[in-house]
Curated annotation (Swiss-Prot):
Protein's name in the database: 2-dehydro-3-deoxyphosphooctonate aldolase
This enzyme's EC code(s): 2.5.1.55
Reactions it catalyzes: D-arabinose 5-phosphate + phosphoenolpyruvate + H2O = 3-deoxy-alpha-D-manno-2-octulosonate-8-phosphate + phosphate
Enzyme class label: transferase
Biological pathway: Carbohydrate biosynthesis; 3-deoxy-D-manno-octulosonate biosynthesis; 3-deoxy-D-manno-octulosonate from D-ribulose 5-phosphate: step 2/3; Bacterial outer membrane biogenesis; lipopolysaccharide biosynthesis
Species this chain originates from: Cupriavidus taiwanensis (strain DSM 17343 / BCRC 17206 / CCUG 44338 / CIP 107171 / LMG 19424 / R1) (Ralstonia taiwanensis (strain LMG 19424))
Lineage, opening ranks: Bacteria, Pseudomonadati, Pseudomonadota, Betaproteobacteria, Burkholderiales
Record SUPFAM superfamilies: Aldolase
Record's subcellular location: Cytoplasm
GO biological process: keto-3-deoxy-D-manno-octulosonic acid biosynthetic process
GO cellular component: cytoplasm
InterPro entries: Aldolase_TIM, DAHP1/KDSA, KDO8P_synthase
Length: 289
């Protein structure tokens, strides 16, 4: 699959989707995007900047949701133009798709909406690549149905059907907790879509602070190493200059100052794993019969 001018897949280096959870200000967006571009350029990692103009699924109705679509898209367009990086943002309603697709390079669907057929179809018919997040309630093999819906819709519109990614972001484990089953990354490859691992939402504790979500950012390096060792096409990470002051998802955000050292380790591991290949491709019962 070609994405934003670079090739993605298990036979290619991982690409990175990264940025603050929500757009807090234009200057912070520009500064963060510029720093991430410098890091990824030095390390040779293809990079897409992400940030949300609206967080429509906050725990509390009193929590900061964002700057709104009009202002948010204006800032993302400025980041794209000024910093020279492709940009991604998420949409939550069908009527947001057209104006957002006119600005960004990649759309993203929230995990909670992965079963909403009309929404997935509308996103697929936008003409943009779509990062489709797997619901916290969904089995990994069920993502094949979601990707198939997107592909069918794209073909019906006369659009390419190979522009969709399947993103793992953890699965609910009791109340206010998520776990990551690394088998799901291999299972989701059966969709035929590039698999992305969301390393920061996977350590989220949904609603764990009462009116907001908690998180365990100390496990981001652990799970991201595990995902890269399993084999993924891309990584998704939210990062912030000062997570303690972040207006959304600070507890699970990677401090911007730590991104380079984390990505350096992951880049080395990714190179090693992909050079060795993936035994599981022919390790099942049929191959052993």
């Amino acid at each position: 699959m070609k994405l934003c001018g670079f090739e993605v897949g298990l036979d290619k280096p991982f690409f990175l989707i990264a940025g603050p959870c929500v757009i807090e200000s234009e200057q912070m967006a520009l500064d963060t995007a510029g720093e991430l571009k410098a890091i990824t350029t030095e390390l040779g990692i293809p990079f897409i900047y992400k940030s949300s103009f609206d967080k429509a699924n906050r725990s509390s109705g009193k929590s900061f949701r964002g700057l709104g679509m009009e202002k948010g898209l204006e800032i993302l367009a400025h980041v794209k133009r000024e910093i020279g990086v492709p940009v991604l943002t998420d949409i939550h309603e069908i009527d947001e798709i057209k104006p957002v697709a006119a600005v960004v390079d990649v759309l993203q669907t929230p995990a909670f909406l992965c079963r909403q057929t009309d929404f997935i179809r509308a996103c697929a018919q936008s003409g943009k690549p779509v990062n489709i997040k797997k619901g916290q309630f969904l089995a990994p093999h069920d993502m094949k149905n979601v990707i198939d819906k997107a592909r069918d819709a794209a073909r019906e519109a006369g659009l390419p059907d190979d522009v969709f990614m399947a993103c793992e972001r953890g699965v609910s484990f009791g109340y206010n907790n998520l776990v990551s089953d690394m088998r799901s990354l291999a299972i989701m490859r059966e969709t035929g879509a590039p698999v992305v691992f969301d390393a920061t939402h996977s350590v989220q504790l949904p609603g764990g602070q009462g009116t907001s979500s908690g998180g365990q950012r100390e496990f981001v390096p652990v799970l991201s190493r595990a995902a890269v060792a399993t084999g993924v096409a891309g990584l998704f990470m939210e990062t912030h200059p000062d997570p303690s002051k972040a207006m959304s998802d600070g507890p699970n955000a990677v401090p911007l100052s730590r991104m380079k050292e984390l990505l350096t380790v992951l880049k080395e591991l990714d190179t090693l794993v992909k050079r060795a290949g993936f035994l599981e491709d022919n390790f099942g019962w049929p191959a052993c019969a």
